[in-house]
């Protein structure tokens, strides 16, 4: 009986993990990106509207997320390559502890703007607004405030940036 319980439990957990990584909950390309205002590491308010007229790459992540931390060097490389273009990089952390968030930003050398609600992931407003079921998740918002790209793990992101900015 216990064996059947564990088999059922593991099957359900696997299905949830696979479903959790599905892009279907993300905002569709062309959709107006929801407005938000969050607090930066420096304690300043940052709104999506602050970046009007520029592309905005939004990286949803957390210090405790292994896949997010593993992707940090790739994001650093993209920032080095495209950071001087008409694009702002914005990290949105799902950390609920400021110290963990700040330490990860410093350790991973994430030198762009970072914001957080400092709440557990599922308790944040922005995770619902942007359909975040798995992290890392990356959005690219166009200069008109519409979704130009959305993907879990950022597959195809560099190709999209190359298409927009014409770099190889």
Residue locations for each model-derived region?
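Thiol/disulfide oxidoreductase modules built on the thioredoxin-like
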Residues: 110, 118-164
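Short loop/turn microsegments at loop-to-beta-strand junctions
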Residues: 33-34, 56, 135-136
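Conserved redox-active cysteine motifs that mediate thiol-disulfide chemistry
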Residues: 60-77
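Short active-site neighborhood of thiol/selenol oxidoreductases, capturing the structured segment around
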Residues: 48-65
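N-terminal "domain-start" segment that seeds a small globular fold
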Residues: 21-48, 166-167
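Conserved segment of the thioredoxin-like fold in thiol-based oxidoreductases
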Residues: 80-122, 128-135
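Bacterial Sec-dependent N-terminal signal peptides
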Residues: 1-24, 168
């Amino acid at each position: 009986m216990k064996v059947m319980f564990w088999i059922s439990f593991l099957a359900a957990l696997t299905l949830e993990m696979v479903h959790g990584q599905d892009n279907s909950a993300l905002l569709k390309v062309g959709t107006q990106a929801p407005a938000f205002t969050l607090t930066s590491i420096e304690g300043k308010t940052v709104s999506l509207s602050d970046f009007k007229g520029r592309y905005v790459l939004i990286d949803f992540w957390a210090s405790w997320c292994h896949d997010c931390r593993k992707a940090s060097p790739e994001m650093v490389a993209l920032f080095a390559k495209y950071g001087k273009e008409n694009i702002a990089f914005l990290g949105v952390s799902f950390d609920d502890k400021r110290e963990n968030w700040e330490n990860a930003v410093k350790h991973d050398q994430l030198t762009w703007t970072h914001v957080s609600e400092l709440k557990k992931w599922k308790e944040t407003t922005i995770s619902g607004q942007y359909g975040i079921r798995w992290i890392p998740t990356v959005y690219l918002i166009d200069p008109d405030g519409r979704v130009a790209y959305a993907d879990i793990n950022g597959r195809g992101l560099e190709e999209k940036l190359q298409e927009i900015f014409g770099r190889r």
